[in-house]
Amino acid sequence: MAAADESSWPADVVEVAKVIDAWGVKGWFRVHPYAADAQAVFTSRRWYLQGPDNRPRPKDAPALPRLLHVTEVKEHGDGIVACAPEVADRSAAEALKGARIFVSRASFPTVGDGEYYWIDLIGLSVVNRDGESLGTVTDLIDTGPHSVLRLGYPSVDDKGAPVEGERLIPFVAAYIDSVQLDQKRIVADWGLDY
């Protein structure tokens, strides 16, 4: 049996950052993480790359590696820099500009009780204490003091045409009774008419 291609993407990849530009002359590159807490970027040593959306690569650009074996990641000023043996010099680092970085969800650090990664909440159904469906988590909003769940649910507009409604629920203990990841469900103290 042949060994699996090392650059094959795992089924659980999550986009966590993008390459901003080259840094220095030895192949280091600057990274912009999407989350304020970039632990997934710091802990994963296998970064899967995809070219930037809607931007053609120059014909003379070197091929974008599908997988980087990251050897070092560190904070630098208000950003993050990283290096990998697949990126030997500044020219190779410049070729990564705009690349999207994905890591395996399995490589994320474990969270404590009552803590969740947003990626694990997106797609969960939300019901209230009466079992009424409030919608499905489509996104979260960071308001500073706490996060807010953004739910989508089927609705109709003033002409009776089907549309997707939006409901916002603060993700705080006062309104969230339980998060049941195994059942893909959140129970909230929230009415349909709120």
From Swiss-Prot:
Keywords: Chaperone, Cytoplasm, Ribosome biogenesis, rRNA processing. It is found in: Cytoplasm. GO terms for molecular function: ribosome binding. Residues 113-194 form the PRC barrel domain. One of its GO terms (biological process) is rRNA processing. Its main location: cytoplasm. GO terms for cellular component: cytoplasm; ribosome. InterPro entries: PRC_barrel-like_sf, PRC_RimM, RimM, RimM_N, RimM_N_sf, Transl_B-barrel_sf. Coiled coil: none annotated. An accessory protein needed during the final step in the assembly of 30S ribosomal subunit, possibly for assembly of the head region. Essential for efficient processing of 16S rRNA. May be needed both before and after RbfA during the maturation of 16S rRNA. It has affinity for free ribosomal 30S subunits but not for 70S ribosomes. The PRC barrel domain binds ribosomal protein uS19. Belongs to the RimM family. Binds ribosomal protein uS19. This is Ribosome maturation factor RimM. It comes from Leptothrix cholodnii (strain ATCC 51168 / LMG 8142 / SP-6).
